[in-house]
Amino acid sequence: MTALTLTPGSATLEHLARIYFDESPVRLDPACRPAVEAAAARIRAAAAGDVPVYGVNTGFGKLASLKVAPQDTATLQRNLILSHCCGVGAPIPRRMARLMMVLKLLSLGRGASGVRWELITLLQEMLARDVTPVIPVQGSVGASGDLAPLAHMTAVIIGAGEAEYQGQRLPGAEALARAGLTPIALGPKEGLAFINGTQFSTAFALAGLFGAWRAATSSLVTAALSTDAIMGSTAPLQPEIHALRGHRGQIDAAARMRALLDGSEIRESHREGDTRVQDPYCIRCQPQVTGAAMDVLRQAAQTLEIEANAATDNPLVLAEADMIVSGGNFHAEPVGFAADLIALALSEIGAIAQRRVALMVDPTLSFDLPPFLTPKPGLNSGLMIAEVTTAALMSENKHLANPCVTDSTPTSANQEDHVSMAAHGAVRLGRMVENLHYILGVELLCAAQGIEFRAPLQTSTALQAAVARLRAEVPRLEEDRYMAPEIETAARLVGAGALLDVVGIDMGGLRP
């Protein structure tokens, strides 16, 4: 696979998605090297001087007023990394750790952190040779950066900590040695440059964003299937309605659903003479709800693309001013807000999908579909409890959607007295995406069953392809059977984007 050449400050969402999903190899554009080396020289000069510079010749956090002798700077940086390796919980997934490493490369490559090029080279080589630090999932409050997770990442660079190599979990030094790499002792400020930053939170937020967008676009397919299954009206999808409001997401969602339903015999069969005047909101207001969620995801995408390219270290080397200045770019508040927005979107997409499932299994609302979508109700319960499962998942996602960024607490002896909780906010997105996959998977099962009850009438060509994709792995439900594996299969199809692959319609992108 050809390596992606990333220019610090110019990495795109498309680059980051390739790194996350495909584990594309990466390298930094070597054109950034002069700026990196100039900043490192500026830090070395400061370390040799008498003027206190935070993290260069001082302690950290509440201990910033304590001066450190020049001969102790290497020990200072090593102690910083080891003392901050306080993460707990399960190791984060390998692909998440790799994305986190790439984000750190992008930040260091801006030439404002003061690290030597040798460290950037080692981090690149760890990625290339499949040395992945073992990073516990819990321990960051999102300011001063993702300290504990980034310390676990950096520990391997200095020959400490643990790493995975060729499927084995090994001491960091051994993993490097097996890969033909050598640890590097940290110089002035280099440990601080590695652990000050938002790369853990940003990696999880990006993964949540990518999963949420795929789920949101897949939900338009399941929504269109549900609409046809209950013989819903397409009148609320008319473009003039959405143009009068003007929101891009709503306009796009309506257009995609019109395209998905175009040519449906089921729709044409009740276009005239339908006694129902209006469908319930979960059918009629789908573009307004899902479209709004898609707009929110695009807003979060813009924030996270900026953050992925940011220098989030402290202090920063300001080259043009020839200054080293303490600031607060490590504070992950933008990431925290983005994660909360993604969580809200995930919750709402699942909430309206769950109502569509409830509509289809209820014979008083489904326009003549049998109870719980089984041919022999009473003897069989059909999809009764599958709908209950979606209610449980919807409720869990509503709870998880409560904002995290508002839950600040003072840390580090009140020196770090406002934090973002971005890490917690971003990590929960993975669980929410998984829950949404299950909700949409059950909707897919229900809607396909409902469509088949409308035979001999056919749905649209695009939606027939979606049903056929499901039926390639899950047969029609005729009698009650063990359902759990089939829900897993349907959720997997949603999560993998399989529905998007077969409908033949461009579902749009995240670009704002």
Curated annotation (Swiss-Prot):
Pathway(s): Amino-acid degradation; L-histidine degradation into L-glutamate; N-formimidoyl-L-glutamate from L-histidine: step 1/3
Crosslink (5-imidazolinone (Ala-Gly)) position: A143-G145
GO biological process: L-histidine catabolic process to glutamate and formamide; L-histidine catabolic process to glutamate and formate
Catalytic activity from the UniProt record: L-histidine = trans-urocanate + NH4(+)
Keyword Cell membrane set for record: no
Compartments, record wording: Cytoplasm
Keyword Lyase part of the UniProt annotation: yes
Post-translational modification: Contains an active site 4-methylidene-imidazol-5-one (MIO), which is formed autocatalytically by cyclization and dehydration of residues Ala-Ser-Gly.
GO MF annotations in UniProt: histidine ammonia-lyase activity
GO cellular component: cytoplasm
EC number: 4.3.1.3
Positions of modified residues (2,3-didehydroalanine (Ser)): S144
Residue stretches spanning the membrane: none
Domain of life the protein comes from: Bacteria
PANTHER family documented for this protein: HISTIDINE AMMONIA-LYASE (PTHR10362)
NCBIfam families: hutH (TIGR01225), PRK09367.1 (NF006871)
HAMAP family in the record: His_ammonia_lyase (MF_00229)
Family: Belongs to the PAL/histidase family.
Protein name: Histidine ammonia-lyase
